[in-house]
Amino acid sequence: MAGTAHQHGRQPQAGGRERSPATVWESAALIALALILCTPFLYLLRSSHSVHPEPVSENRFIGSEACGACHQPSFDQWQNSHHDLAMDIASEATVLGDFNDIAYTDPHNQVTSRFFRQGDKFMVETEGPDGTLQTFEITHTFGVYPLQQYLIPFPGGRLQCLNIAWNSRDNRWYRVPPYDVKGTDDWLHWTKGGQTWNGMCAECHSTDLAKNYDMDTDTYQTTWFEIDVGCEACHGPGSNHAEWAKKPAMARSRIDNAGLVVDTSDISSSRFISICAPCHSRRYQLGDNRHQAEDVLDTMVPSLLEEGLYYPDGQILEEVYVYGSYAQSKMFRHDVRCSDCHDVHSLKLHKEGNDLCLQCHRAAEYDRYEHHFHQRQFEGKPSDGHLCVKCHMPARTYMGADHRPDHSIRVPRPDLSESLATPNSCSTAGCHADKALSWVTDHYNRWYGASKKPHYGDLIAAARAADPDAAEGLRTLAGDALSPVIVRATALSLLRNYPGPATTDAMIAALEDDDSLIRHTAIRGLQNLDLQTRLTHIAPKLYDRVKGVRIEAAAALASVPKTSLKDDDVEAFEAALREYQAAMRYNADFAPQRYNLGNLAAAQGDNDKAIGYYQQAIKIDDQFYPAKVNLAMLFNRTGNNEAAANLLREVIAGNPQLHEAVYSLGLLLAEMGKLEEAAELLGRAADSMPEYTRPRYNQALALLKLKRYEEGEQALLKALEVEPANREYFSTLANLYLSFNLIDRARTLVETTLEKVPDHAEALQLRDLIRQNRTPP
């Protein structure tokens, strides 16, 4: 209110009486004296604040209790919040589950577990890593509501998350998904890597967590400063701030942000959201959180709108948390931040029901029947159909008990449900799930009109289905600055399936985008291009200010000889490559990161090291098929074709939908001379991927070598039907006809081709030869 006080000071005195000259001179003298007396203090104040700031010592963590000594209201709000109760030592005060010798039979695998006490200890008898019933001590609780999970110590410094949890809403034991665990060797079994607390959960449930995974010994020495999510998990280490705050106000030197590492005041919405994003997102971490990131991609790389994680229109499907969905929302683009709805300390909503939304949206326009068309009372009972969140934030249930609203905050689109088989809030359980989709659409169109805006979901769905017509739309969407960044990056990523000059140009343009996620995705799209393209366009990104972009550039340039790099670029490349390797080693308790290290070794020509990394990835997760496919390719390259074929057969047996693996095995068997099986597999691959013509062409070649000429002819015709301009396919079929003197068929081939591709050089040449009654020798 300083401005208001200043304005009041300029108002006339009461009664409007003017002051005498003597009074004015007396006032002036007093002011002058005050200035003289204050000058030394002003100088000292100025000096301490701006000329010679005191050196700042290394920041250390001090704990939430220390913060609460000064910030009592915030501390009180934080206590008993989900952050405060994120993890704890198992005790009478913290354990919610019933351990009074309670038996629970898992309906999915018929294993009966028993929960009981052994003195002060909390025990469970359940299926162990070898499939037999074993007894384990529970040492830690994990979470509190709507479920509480339990952690069990295992060798190698591991804590394993039991797959049976306590439903604290319904007060019962229940099995936590996933349910399709294929035995005790499955990575998803509760005793294996998919349920290891150290790598899967720990970083977001404790403060100053250091994972400390040693990939050489496959062990952890995980530590934390505070077991739960305390003040410093968001604000960063607080020792410098505490020292600063202890001093009298006049003695406090000017240090940035009062000594706090993370600035949470007077920052942009995107910067604010980036504080929450590292935990509230589907992503992979680049290292322990040191609270010094300027950009989200300095600490993690968020998942895009990938198939299996999101529906094609961007609605949540798998457990993706909040960031990826919220980043699509209009709220995100209009600078609405998490704290506008959630209290940052208690995590509770500021208001209940529609009042939360009416903080910004006009009640007269939105909180009325003419907008939502739902009554507050229906058939004599309260109805929640009028609530904003029921339509705009439909929830999905995760972990078998946790109902999480979709934070993309979207307008319902039942029309997309018809075309894309995506969910819509009208048809969800508890609303109109019993009604036909046509009934929902009819009502929606009657209320809001049938005219619909174009939606990126149509394009993403088409690209996922490898629609050849999707490429142009993807390029447009990737370059559309008005679309959400995560949507643009997804379009750019999907463009990798449409190689060609136009796609390359789009990727190169995206390298200069302001957003790091776009730049990161563009590098991935260029990493398999020729040496000169990568040197020209990717090498400058070795200097990018964002870590996630730099290390992706280093990985993309790994196969480039250092002699091809400029002298200055060699040092930048080596520095970024070290960052990349450190990030992969940090996450090497997961198969994908060992796989990435294998790819790096292979790119650098170290086949033995690459084979070792691929085998380690497979040992971690036997169902991680990319490592098996790449290992098979490496075996093939080093002459071990039998081992390569066996690996690919293993992949296909467990993943029959992996048509690329079927194609690879077909090619390998053709190379090995096993043409009958090769032709069958190549045909399967071609049938499964009709948009890709190469499998069909290779099937044709195998059939021709087997002297199954008519089948080979049909395969070539199918390939040309999809890609009529392909000269290689045309020439192979033309030579087949000419070798058997099938001139009429050759003439028909020429005519059909020229109808579709009038300037087809080979077809024009063959037409002239046929007209002259000549054929090539």
List where the protein language model places each region.
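Structural signature of tandem alpha-helical TPR/SEL1-like repeats
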Residues: P501-A502, T533-L535, D569-Q581, Q604-Q616, ...
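Helix-start (N-cap) detector for alpha-helical repeat units in TPR-like alpha-solenoids
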Residues: V485, S516-R519, K547, A591-P592, ...
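Structural marker of alpha-solenoid helical repeat scaffolds
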Residues: Y498, D513, L529, D544-R545, ...
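Primarily the internal scaffold of c-type cytochrome electron-transfer domains
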Residues: E65, P73-G143, Q149-P155, C161-N163, ...
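Amphipathic alpha-helical scaffolding segments comprising HEAT/armadillo-like alpha-solenoid repeats
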Residues: P468-A478, G500-E512, D530-L542, S564-Q581
